[in-house]
UniProtKB/Swiss-Prot annotation:
Residues 480-579 form the Fibronectin type-III domain. It is found in: Endoplasmic reticulum membrane. Keywords: Endoplasmic reticulum, Glycoprotein, Glycosyltransferase, Membrane, Signal-anchor, Transferase, Transmembrane, Transmembrane helix. Residues 1-4 are cytoplasmic. PANTHER family: GLYCOSYLTRANSFERASE, PROTEIN O-LINKED-MANNOSE BETA-1,4-N-ACETYLGLUCOSAMINYLTRANSFERASE 2. It catalyses: 3-O-(alpha-D-mannosyl)-L-threonyl-[protein] + UDP-N-acetyl-alpha-D-glucosamine = 3-O-(N-acetyl-beta-D-glucosaminyl-(1->4)-alpha-D-mannosyl)-L-threonyl-[protein] + UDP + H(+). This is Protein O-linked-mannose beta-1,4-N-acetylglucosaminyltransferase 2. The chain crosses the membrane at residues 5-25. Glycans are attached at residues 98, 275, 542. It holds the Pfam family Glyco_transf_61. The gene is pomgnt2. Its main location: endoplasmic reticulum. The keyword Oxidoreductase does not apply. One of its GO terms (cellular component) is endoplasmic reticulum membrane.
Length: 579
């Protein structure tokens, strides 16, 4: 072989090696450029820094991880690491690797009916959440993900056009869900997945976080595959007090877990975020607020109503309107009012900003029974809200104006059969019904009303007679007693048919630090083997029982403390007493 041939072969090898290295460098450069691009896309979402390569490697190697609280889909909230969302499929994706965690691991039970509720409205079939599953290895076939570095709270707004729903279903639950998980702080990102646009009250959602909330429609702008590095999905339902009648007619929830203390704390925080201060005035500064509506459910003689209130109570009367004023300015006015008067409607949720001791007056159109529609009555009655509620109902049919030719959603009935229209018009009382399209309910609730001033003032004065005298109470007024201490029993047999049982105990430890108006003790005595027990309420810390106490018998005895007749403490450990 000649030297030239040898050199040519060597040159070809060197060139090939250089080309291969160049192609690898180009490939690596392209990969780095793509990662840089995806990092920029991620940082379009947030100012938080993210190492794209590290995040992608974590997703590929460890997959998605999920740990949830709650036993049922109706009370479950889940935390995810690296849960992704495919905007093309409009589905969340759980990527499985050998390091993935899924607790609870429900298998197909995850679809019976869902993993969790995306909103605080319980078990509504439009609010269910679930995800698709893929092996992490399929990431190589999918578009490069955009990572969201913020901690996200992902939820559905239930009805963002309605102020009552905004507060009751969304803001309060989201606020206290964020309190439940420490990393859902003011830097967290809210992500709304129900598909609505911003709506008229979007500024209120912005108060929950320093980050702009994201809408479902906006997610596709950031890429075909978005991955949330850390997210929480679902809302706490503990702050809700009302159910809307999807399964049974609407009314207060059966098991209300929130008090006025939590509602008032939430209201205080929102007022601070809106730069609203609560004015502290004396009696000379008292005034009444009347809510004015401009399109439906009108008070047709509003000026007369305002004048009557001013004359009756010798107070200034202020009118407010959601259509004409900013929400913050309305809250500023309501926050120091003595009384809030309004036709039934979502605007009455602003009663949660009223000061303690204020009065809520709710007006109802003809044929609408106040006892059947009670979200604001229930709010006012929550322990610690300290609001007094009064309702007035129009009972005079001639004082109402109906709108049968409006669209059905505003109470129109022209689309119904003539016989059904006649039945609805003739009805004097809307029967109990389910949500949400009952035509008789809509026809009546969207009426306009001339308020009969004499009957209105009569209802107001009767209601005010029942108003308790509100005093600024100290926190200890609502605190419960602890367990009684050192409970013990002694027995003695008097005769073959008579015995005595003496029970004694020490007061709860926390009682010595509290100012309590009344302290009593409850004792339960049960003969072993029997199903019934004898209850006793006692003012002292020891007592000798002889009635119905038999010799040579074992009794089970429980003791607890009661503050102010209704603040019950826990029972101490059961005593076993043998006579």
């Amino acid at each position: 072989m000649g030297v030239g041939t040898l050199l040519n072969g060597l040159l070809v090898s060197v060139v090939a090696a250089l080309l291969w290295k160049y192609s690898k460098l180009s490939e690596h450069a392209a990969l780095l450029e793509e990662e840089l691009h995806m990092t920029r896309r991620s940082q379009e979402l947030s100012q938080a820094h993210i190492d794209y390569h590290v995040a992608l490697q974590a997703l590929q190697e460890h997959g998605t991880r999920m740990v949830c609280t709650g036993k049922m889909h109706t009370d479950r909230i889940c935390r995810f690491d690296y849960l992704c969302y495919c905007s093309e499929a409009e589905e969340f994706v759980f990527f499985h690797s050998n390091s993935s965690v899924m607790l609870p691991n429900l298998g197909s039970r995850r679809f019976q009916p869902a993993l969790l509720d995306l909103s605080s409205v319980e078990d509504h079939n439009t609010q269910y959440f679930n995800f698709l599953e893929l092996p992490a290895a399929t990431l190589r076939f999918l578009p490069k993900p955009v990572f969201v570095p913020d901690v996200a709270l992902i939820l559905n707004r239930f009805n963002p056009d309605n102020l009552m729903h905004v507060f009751h279903d969304d803001l309060l639950p989201a606020f206290y869900t964020m309190k439940q998980f420490l990393d859902l702080d003011e830097d967290a990102r809210l992500v709304f997945m129900e598909g609505w646009d911003e709506g008229p009250h979007f500024h209120l959602y912005r108060l929950l976080s320093d980050k702009q909330p994201l809408l479902k429609e906006q997610l596709r702008n950031f890429g075909k595959l978005m991955c949330f590095t850390k997210s929480y999905i679902g809302l706490s339902k503990m702050t809700t007090w009302y159910q809307y009648g999807f399964v049974q007619p609407q009314g207060p929830k059966a098991n209300i877990l929130v008090s006025g203390n939590e509602i008032r704390h939430f209201a205080k925080v929102l007022m601070e975020k809106m730069n609203v201060t609560r004015a502290e005035g004396g009696q000379e500064d008292e005034y009444i607020v009347v809510f004015s509506r401009s399109s439906t459910r009108l008070i047709l003689n509003q000026a007369e109503l305002v004048m009557a209130l001013a004359q009756e109570f010798q107070m200034r009367v202020v009118t407010v309107s959601l259509e004409e004023q900013s929400f913050a300015s309305i809250v500023q006015v309501i926050g120091a009012a003595s009384m809030l008067v309004s036709m039934h409607g979502a605007q009455l949720i602003t009663a949660l900003f009223l000061p303690p001791g204020a009065v809520v007056v709710e007006l109802f159109p003809f044929a609408v029974n106040p006892d059947q529609y009670t979200p604001y009555r229930t709010l006012a009655a929550l322990p610690g809200m300290d609001l007094h509620y009064i309702s007035w109902r129009n009972t005079e049919e001639e004082n109402t104006i109906t709108h049968p030719d409006r669209p059905w959603e505003q109470g129109g009935i022209a689309h119904l059969e003539k016989e059904e229209q006649e039945r609805i018009v003739a009805s004097k009382d809307v029967p109990r019904h389910l949500c949400c399209r009952n035509p008789e309910w809509l026809f009546r609730i969207y009426q306009d009303t001339f308020v009969d001033i004499p009957s209105f003032l009569e209802a107001l004065q009767a209601g005010l007679k029942a108003k308790p005298v509100w005093k600024k109470s100290k926190l200890s007024g609502g605190l419960h007693p602890g367990r009684v201490r050192d409970a013990r029993c002694q027995t003695s047999v008097q005769t073959s048919s008579e015995a005595k049982l003496t029970v004694s105990w020490q007061m709860p430890w926390n009682l010595k630090y509290l100012k309590v108006r009344e302290v009593k003790y409850e004792v339960w005595i049960q003969e072993q083997g029997e199903n019934t027990y004898m209850p006793y309420i006692l003012p002292q810390q020891n007592y000798t029982f002889s009635d119905n106490i038999k010799p040579f018998t074992t009794y089970l005895v429980w003791v607890r403390c009661i503050f102010n007749k209704n603040l019950l403490g826990p029972f101490a450990d059961v005593l076993m007493c043998r006579t």
